[in-house]
Amino acid sequence: MSRNLIVGLDVGTSKICTVVAEVNLNDQLEIVGIGTSISRGVRKGVLINIEAALDSISNSIEAAELISGCDITSLSVSMSGSSVEGTNSRGVVAINSKTREINEEDVERVIEAAKAIVIPMDREILHVIPQEFIVDGIPHIKNPIDMMGIRLEGEVHIITGSSSSSQNLVRCVNRAGFAVDEVVLGSLASSYATLSKEEREMGVLFIDMGKGTTDIILYIDGSPYYTGVIPIGVNRVTLDIAQVWKVPEDVAENIKITAGIAHPSILESQMETVIIPNLGTRPPQEKSRKELSVIINSRLREIFEMMKAEILKRGLYNKINGGIVLTGGGALFPGISNLIEEVFNYPARIGLPMSINGIGEEHIDPKFSSALGLVLYKHEQQKFNKLKKVSSKVKRKNKISSKLKGWFLKEWF
């Protein structure tokens, strides 16, 4: 019997990660292989050199195949970059049935109506995510199926991205010998791996801070209402250290990883030092770790202040009742939660990927949130599509079962 595999490929600026998961007979997900490689040909989340990226992608997938013992044929791939944007839209349809009872087809029609927005020729729709429905003027409805009405409105969040970026990504994976099932927004995948349903319902600001970009999703009442990208990531911190302390970038990166902290308040002693190794004829130098923390804190604070300004501009700042969750490589800075709480005045936590069968401790790390989120996202989608097929058969004999309606409510919305 063939294995039911789900494969996610996270194409980041610092690393490429492939996750292979198997769906067992109990419909549970189990991680069977993870392969990583150094990312080349990718800048700020966008492919800039297909040949270089092709090698990195191939190496990551081959490593995952070797560990899992599987032959990968197709996969879902993450996309990020400053071209990604989110917008909210509304659609309206009339309920045409004699009974005025709203069914799945009506929901699909209103979502299609909401999707009918004008987007530039160089952009494409990545995701359309329902937020709420309004039946005859009654708002805040999550699942309108089986309700009575004559007018159905649907509000959705539409995420778009650069067509050329998406096409180049797909082309690169195809050239490596693999089919692409879907292009998924990387931060959306990460949120699947790290956020609880309660946080999404309460309203949570989700931040995925990578090497090249910082991606944001603001969830309200369980759905995204704002998606944005700040084209600055933790690599900018490395460049700041290199510039201020006049060291090569690789030395600055090592200093950042081994001694960097995001908030001076967590220093055990103000006298702590950092040793800069000898460079050519220049002897080793001793620098203040507090000075290092100030360099890092300044850049990270700037990024978070930019985020805060965007959310304030949209009038959504008072909706973050569930706090702030940070994941990605930027979440590894000690003290970064302190800084976020200082800037936003909301509680903050580090978002670790949820535990999945087969996952090793070394992969329960913010750096792997997007890759693991891809397989979780596709698994939920797979379960939903399976139940929709069952639902179609059930409807021919009866109304949609309460079990299916509950699934519809829980997983789609």
UniProtKB/Swiss-Prot annotation:
Predominant cellular place of this UniProt entry's protein: membrane
Record-linked Pfam families: FtsA, SHS2_FTSA
Keyword Cell membrane among UniProt keywords: yes
Membrane topology listed for this record: Peripheral membrane protein
Compartment(s): Cell inner membrane
One GO cellular component term: cell division site
One GO biological process term: FtsZ-dependent cytokinesis
Record InterPro entries: ATPase_NBD, Cell_div_FtsA, FtsA/MreB, SHS2_FtsA
Keyword Electron transport: no
Keywords: Cell cycle, Cell division, Cell inner membrane, Cell membrane, Membrane
Its biological purpose: Cell division protein that is involved in the assembly of the Z ring. May serve as a membrane anchor for the Z ring.
Assembly with partners or alone: Self-interacts. Interacts with FtsZ.
Family that this chain belongs to: Belongs to the FtsA/MreB family.
Family annotation (HAMAP family): FtsA (MF_02033)
Name of the featured protein: Cell division protein FtsA
Species, as recorded: Borreliella burgdorferi (strain ATCC 35210 / DSM 4680 / CIP 102532 / B31)
Record gene name: ftsA
